[in-house]
């Protein structure tokens, strides 16, 4: 069975607009897909001409970037990508004079965007791949709180050479990646870089020898940075801590802090941001349930490779470690260098210390005894930070400053420049 199934479904929006949702379904139990799966897409039903298309589903950005150009031959008046954080669809391509890129298709109770829209920065530079070829990179720098209105006047840099292939690079919303792919589609090929793959994936273009849809090219990477595993028993606040650490570290270090969510819960950045809005919490839980995966033999192998690749292209990697310690997890464990534990149960800590220290050889940075109370009590600072802290609730991006500071102190000691 193909790993990616596509189904066009008629849909009527809250204001009566007739559209079609192109639903992206990942058919694998673990919800993992590989670039070569783009070569075996299965269309259960295809888009109908004359009706706008909304790309909808949970998939890597390179899947969305590949699907938008594939919809063009169906003569649809516009293409949009579903943005769960707005509960709306963002127009990324249109032939309708009444619409333009960046406009929103309201799906009912859409969420207001920031009133001021800051421009995205695009920078052209060559990068080397492991096959010794130099590729043209279009780096994307997205300001915090970016508005979809940036698409209205978005153009490619004048020094971008469309007689060469283009690699899109950087952390950006799916709608921005998809729009840039469409703008650059007249190049011989367009690729989107994926940090966990340490590769770029061919998603569009006019075809070129040796570069077809779904091909992946590994780029030259640097020395491996530290990777901090964040572990502990269920219902202790592990994912809340991981997200808060990522937010705090990115604000201090910059965007080259990578979060690898090595669990099957179906939560991503989108879930955390949606759950922070009370109006989107129910929808967030629906999408989380739909994206929830099952653990398979390749699950931890996949995430182990992703952590190793991310370590070679980041300044620091955080690993939100799902489940409980078992033999299958050791491969992923050995890709990490340090660990932080958070637990609401003291009796669970010895098992986790044994797993991380004795089996993984990792260095402990901190132990947090989580509580539902608003509390911060430092128990010790050496040989690792130990504290009682809380509460840890979804939808909040704040945590005790000491927890951020200990990571910063150790990161500095490990040679990570700030």
Predicted regions and their residues:
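Conserved catalytic-core segment of NTP-binding enzymes
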Residues: 322-402
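P-loop (Walker A) phosphate-binding loop of NTP-binding proteins
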Residues: 58, 171, 233
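Short hydrophobic/aromatic beta-strand immediately N-terminal to the Walker A/P-loop
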Residues: 54, 167, 228-231
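Glycine-rich phosphate-binding P-loop
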Residues: 228-247
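Switch II (G3) loop of P-loop NTPases
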Residues: 291, 309-327
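Conserved NTP-binding/hydrolysis module of P-loop NTPases
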Residues: 271-291
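Long, low-complexity, Lys/Arg-enriched
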Residues: 1-52, 58, 63-163, 176-226
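Short beta-strand-centered segment that lines the nucleotide-binding/catalytic pocket of NTP-utilizing
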Residues: 251-270
């Amino acid at each position: 069975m193909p790993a990616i199934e596509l189904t066009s479904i008629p849909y009527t929006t809250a204001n009566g607009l007739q559209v079609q949702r192109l639903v992206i379904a990942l058919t694998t139990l673990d919800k993992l897909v590989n670039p070569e799966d783009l070569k075996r897409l299965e269309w259960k039903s295809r888009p109908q001409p004359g009706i706008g298309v909304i790309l909808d589903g949970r998939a890597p950005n390179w899947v969305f970037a590949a699907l938008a150009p594939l919809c063009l031959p169906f003569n649809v008046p516009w293409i949009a990508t579903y943005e769960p954080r707005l509960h709306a669809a963002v127009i990324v391509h249109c032939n309708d004079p009444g619409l333009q890129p960046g406009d929103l298709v309201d799906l009912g109770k859409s969420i207001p965007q920031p009133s001021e829209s800051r421009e995205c920065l695009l920078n052209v530079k060559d990068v080397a791949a492991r096959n010794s070829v130099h590729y043209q990179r279009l780096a994307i720098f997205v300001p915090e709180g970016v508005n979809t209105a940036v698409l209205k006047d978005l153009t490619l840099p004048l020094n971008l050479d469309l007689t060469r292939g283009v690699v899109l690079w950087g952390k950006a919303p799916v709608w921005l990646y998809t729009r840039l792919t469409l703008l650059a589609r007249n190049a011989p090929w367009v690729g989107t870089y994926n940090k966990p793959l340490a590769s770029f994936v061919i998603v569009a273009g006019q075809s070129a020898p040796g570069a077809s849809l779904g091909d992946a090219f590994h780029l030259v990477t640097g020395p491996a940075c530290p990777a901090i595993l964040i572990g502990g028993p269920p219902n202790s606040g592990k994912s809340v801590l991981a997200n808060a650490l990522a937010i705090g570290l990115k604000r201090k270090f910059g965007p080259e802090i990578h979060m690898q969510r090595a669990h099957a819960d179906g939560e991503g950045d989108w879930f955390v941001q949606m759950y922070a809005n009370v109006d989107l919490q129910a929808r967030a839980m629906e999408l989380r349930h739909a994206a929830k995966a099952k653990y398979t033999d390749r699950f931890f192998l996949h995430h182990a490779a992703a952590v190793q690749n991310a370590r070679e292209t980041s300044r620091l990697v955080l690993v939100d470690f799902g489940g409980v310690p078992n033999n299958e997890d050791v491969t992923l464990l050995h890709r990490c260098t340090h660990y932080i534990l958070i637990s609401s149960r003291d009796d669970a800590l010895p098992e986790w210390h044994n797993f991380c220290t004795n089996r993984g050889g990792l260095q402990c940075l901190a132990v947090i005894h989580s509580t539902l109370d608003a509390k911060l009590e430092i128990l010790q600072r050496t040989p690792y930070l130990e504290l009682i802290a809380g509460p840890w609730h979804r939808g909040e991006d704040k945590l005790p400053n000491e927890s951020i500071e200990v990571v910063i102190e150790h990161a500095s000691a490990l040679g990570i420049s700030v």
